[in-house]
Amino acid sequence: MFISILLLALAVERILCANILCVFPTPAYSHQSVFSAYIDKLSWAGHNVTVITPMPRAVDHVHQVVSSLSVHYFNNLIKNSTMIKKRGVVADETTVTKENYMGLINLVAHEIKSPNVTRLLRNKGNKFDLIVCEAYVSYILVFGAIYDAPVIQFSSGYAIPENFETVGGEVARNHIKHPNIWRSDFSKSNFEQLMTENYLKNEWALLEKEQENMLKRDFGYHHDMCQLKSRVLMLFINVPAVFDNNRDVSNNIQYLGGIHLKKPRTVRDSRLLSFMEKHHIIVYASFGSGIDVLNMDANLIAEFVRVFNSIPYAVLWKVDSSIHLKHNISSNVHTQSWFPQRDVLNHPHIKVFITQGGVQSTDEAVNSGVPMIGIPIMGDQFYNVRRYTELGIGEKVNILRLEEEGLDRKIKNLVHNKSYELNIKRLNLFISDTPVKPLRKALWFTNYVLRNKDAIDKFK
């Protein structure tokens, strides 16, 4: 009897104290804020967590393997990519090509070949029970083969069709209900939409083939990508299921959403708080951490200045202070290069959020009940903003035609039409009404994979 109890205790300890390697190479705050919350949850639950990251934090409860130089590399990549962008910042579906995305894949390869990661790989004493990889890069699936471990793919936002196909998703592609998240134009004819879907599928297949070739070059790995993908047992998607149009998925695909959200605080900046308390209707405008407003073409910037100066409301605008050197900014507009966005959105005087449509910004706006005007610029932002209008929680503006889109009119509409605020508050209640919070759900299903990895592989 004692031996049985001891063996059971050891088994539980093995599950609760697994060695987990997380590979999260994208040097973007919007990605890393999600992954950091997940990593912390794993560690606090008793797991030994090692993370390969280009953006280390001042923490000691996880082992961080810093992939050197990638932030600098990423900044240069963004800077050099302006040649493919419209109006200085816009990367729509026409820019999604194998050639354009190879810079990002090379960035990841650069990280994996960095000294610290190389040292990790050369240490033959390292053993991992589970690999958790960022979902959109297939190159890093090689860690599953290196350590002979099961893999969870984790997307900080929406998942791409190829992710669903990896875990056997039967509804990976549906150009009407579940369009490819790289699409930006949803007004085309049915035939044109199918052509765009096929084009994106082919470009991504070329990109995956190139990653396969890189693995042969960098690791001597001579198997095809399908064999690496066969180790993937679970897919985490960090958006609420309703935003992905309630896709019919199996148990090995789990929607999360908002796992980075922390309890908002009172705005601490006294100057900012004074401005916010003085004005009772405030529009907050931010295009996220990855977009520099000053990279927009001159006419775009001038139109934003015109609109913000002219509307009868106060404006908080995330933009570098150097904008004042070329433009006359009205006293109703308060500019800063950074805002405590979570806290700002929770202030009762914020009535409209002008956003690029990033997933994390959307989570924060929904949680705070602030209607949005989405001005998508790249990636999944176009699809995400499309959902604003479909769910009745905001409006969209085409940045390529900003001057004709009537941004000032749409701002006034959101301020005065209370249906947007009502809808977004209802949506927040609906999303929040779950038996388990998203971060705890992610932990439970991570442990589920650790407990049942052999059975999942057999019966998937």
Swiss-Prot record:
<dbReference type="Pfam" id="PF00201">
    <property type="entry name" value="UDPGT"/>
</dbReference>
<dbReference type="GO" id="GO:0008194">
    <property type="term" value="F:UDP-glycosyltransferase activity"/>
</dbReference>
<protein>
    <recommendedName>
        <fullName>Ecdysteroid UDP-glucosyltransferase</fullName>
        <ecNumber>2.4.1.-</ecNumber>
    </recommendedName>
</protein>
<keyword id="KW-0808">Transferase</keyword>
<dbReference type="InterPro" id="IPR050271">
    <property type="entry name" value="UDP-glycosyltransferase"/>
</dbReference>
<dbReference type="InterPro" id="IPR016224">
    <property type="entry name" value="Ecdysteroid_UDP-Glc_Trfase"/>
</dbReference>
<keyword id="KW-0732">Signal</keyword>
<dbReference type="InterPro" id="IPR035595">
    <property type="entry name" value="UDP_glycos_trans_CS"/>
</dbReference>
<comment type="similarity">
    <text>Belongs to the UDP-glycosyltransferase family.</text>
</comment>
<keyword id="KW-0328">Glycosyltransferase</keyword>
<feature type="signal peptide">
    <location>
        <begin position="1"/>
        <end position="18"/>
    </location>
</feature>
<comment type="function">
    <text>Catalyzes the transfer of glucose from UDP-glucose to ecdysteroids which are insect molting hormones. Expression of egt interferes with normal insect development and block molting.</text>
</comment>
<dbReference type="InterPro" id="IPR002213">
    <property type="entry name" value="UDP_glucos_trans"/>
</dbReference>
